Design a protein with these regions (language model features):
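Conserved, structured core segments of small domains
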Residues: 1-102
Length: 102
């Protein structure tokens, strides 16, 4: 299965590592508020960074193995489908963490 990606801040990722799972959907909304965690394909990450993360420092891109998530992953949206994780993201499902900038 192809990896999916999520952009977050270093601080939020560090908190998730300490907790064992990640529960933030977007910069401003939690998993509980949104109902899922917003993700992107590799090709969608640059556009996501441009649209939502301009001027934000200390960003990281989480590379996620969907087979390790343990929650439903659905591709949704029109005209372009984005991957959504319908549950918390286990830290163990993140196979790489890379610094990125918008």
């Amino acid at each position: 299965m192809n990896p999916i990606f999520h952009v977050t801040t270093v601080d939020r990722w560090s908190a998730a590592v300490a907790a064992g799972e990640y529960r933030q959907s977007t910069l401003d909304r939690t998993l509980e508020e949104e109902g899922f965690i917003h993700c992107s394909t590799a090709a969608q990450v640059p556009g996501t960074l441009q649209r939502f993360y301009q001027g934000i420092d200390d960003l990281v891109r989480l590379e996620i193995d969907p087979s390790l998530v343990g929650a439903e992953v659905r591709y949704e949206g029109d005209p372009e489908a984005f991957p959504h994780i319908y549950g918390p993201l286990p830290v163990a499902a993140v196979v790489a963490v890379e610094p990125v900038s918008a």
